[in-house]
């Protein structure tokens, strides 16, 4: 009888633990508004994501560009999983990022945030001047001074995230994403795994990897630990509309619903300083000139891809 009671207690405790860990963005008792009740750091003063208001970003010419090694084509097998919230790819420890202060970070995993619910197609976590972009890519790293990610994730200087926005227009297919997107069909349900053979993260990122915004914040999902050095790239990844649609509509969550709008709302800046290593050209050159310059760049980029 005592053994039966013990088993029942363990079952109930396990069910409670599973419920507590099953956070969501917009549904149930553990939606985004209730994260701080179970994960106190989510109610902290240095939370992410934030709105990057360019007129208030401080240009710091002493900030060097990011030095990335191992981001180019790598042979091997790379696990890819539907974790119920997004798609996540495990990355090799040979991928490293050295930042302006000399700290070396080791890549751990990459994942995506997107929109797609009803008429809302934009799903980036960070916004720029209040504008939410279509998708946001996160490459999570840990400080190489620590032996593992598990140790670093609790350290005050433990983590760094490289973020990039995705832009969608009438672009042709971005073939650097073709293999990744084709594998989404293999992980429709939470917990399902597949394997990518060969991976080139550098080609999945924007062409310009040197211009970025940076600030100190947190993980954007529970436990929302405030130990993340953020690097948000200024340039964009370009995907076709079909590719974006497939990413937004291929995976199901733990409630058997399509994963849509898997992003956290922007958090208060709370007197933090956001820096960039490039001047804000929109305001130094004039907004109208910058608008037409951007349009010309888009047309040239489209023609280059069409001719290849």
UniProtKB/Swiss-Prot annotation:
Catalysed reactions, as listed in the record: hydrogencarbonate + H(+) = CO2 + H2O
UniProt cross-references to PROSITE patterns, sorted A to Z: ALPHA_CA_1, ALPHA_CA_2
Compartments it resides in: Secreted
Protein origin, superkingdom: Eukaryota
The entry's keywords: Disulfide bond, Glycoprotein, Lyase, Metal-binding, Secreted, Signal, Zinc
Notes on activation and inhibition: Inhibited by coumarins, sulfonamide derivatives such as acetazolamide (AZA), saccharin and Foscarnet (phosphonoformate trisodium salt).
Domain Alpha-carbonic anhydrase stretches: 21-278
CDD domains, alphabetized: alpha_CA_VI
Binding site for substrate: 220-221
Tissue localization of expression: Major constituent of saliva.
InterPro entries: CA_dom, CA_dom_sf, Carbonic_anhydrase_a-class, Carbonic_anhydrase_a-class_CS
Record Pfam families: Carb_anhydrase (PF00194)
Function: Reversible hydration of carbon dioxide. Its role in saliva is unknown.
Protein name as catalogued: Carbonic anhydrase 6
Source organism of this protein record: Homo sapiens
Record gene name: CA6
């Amino acid at each position: 009888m005592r053994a039966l009671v013990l088993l029942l207690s363990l079952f109930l405790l396990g069910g409670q633990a599973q419920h507590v860990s099953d956070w969501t963005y917009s549904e149930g008792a553990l939606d985004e508004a209730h994260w701080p009740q179970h994960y106190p750091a989510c109610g902290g003063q240095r939370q992410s994501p934030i709105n990057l208001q360019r007129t208030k970003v401080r240009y710091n010419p002493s900030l060097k560009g990011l030095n990335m090694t191992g981001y180019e084509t790598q042979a091997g097998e790379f696990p890819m999983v539907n974790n119920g919230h997004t798609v996540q790819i495990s990355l090799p420890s040979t991928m490293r990022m050295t930042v302006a202060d000399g700290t070396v970070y080791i890549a751990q995993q990459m994942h995506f945030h997107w929109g797609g619910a009803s008429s809302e197609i934009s799903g980036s976590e960070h916004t720029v001047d209040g504008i939410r972009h279509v998708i946001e890519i996160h490459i999570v790293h840990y400080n190489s001074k620590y032996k593992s990610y598990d140790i670093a994730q609790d350290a005050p200087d433990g983590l760094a995230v490289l973020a990039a926005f995705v832009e969608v227009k009438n672009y042709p297919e971005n073939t650097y994403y073709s293999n990744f997107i084709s594998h989404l069909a293999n992980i429709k349900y939470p917990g399902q795994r597949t394997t990518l053979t060969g991976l080139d993260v550098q080609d999945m990122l924007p062409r310009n990897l040197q211009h970025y915004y940076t600030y100190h914040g947190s993980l954007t999902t529970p436990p929302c630990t405030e130990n993340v050095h953020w690097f948000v790239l200024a340039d964009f990844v370009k995907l076709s509309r079909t590719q974006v649609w497939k990413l937004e509509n291929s995976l199901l969550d733990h409630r058997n619903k399509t994963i849509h709008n898997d992003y956290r709302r922007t958090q208060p800046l709370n007197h933090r300083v956001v820096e960039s290593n490039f001047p804000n050209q929109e305001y130094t050159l004039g907004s109208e000139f910058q608008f037409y310059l951007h349009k010309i760049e888009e047309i040239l980029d489209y023609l280059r891809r069409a001719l290849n």
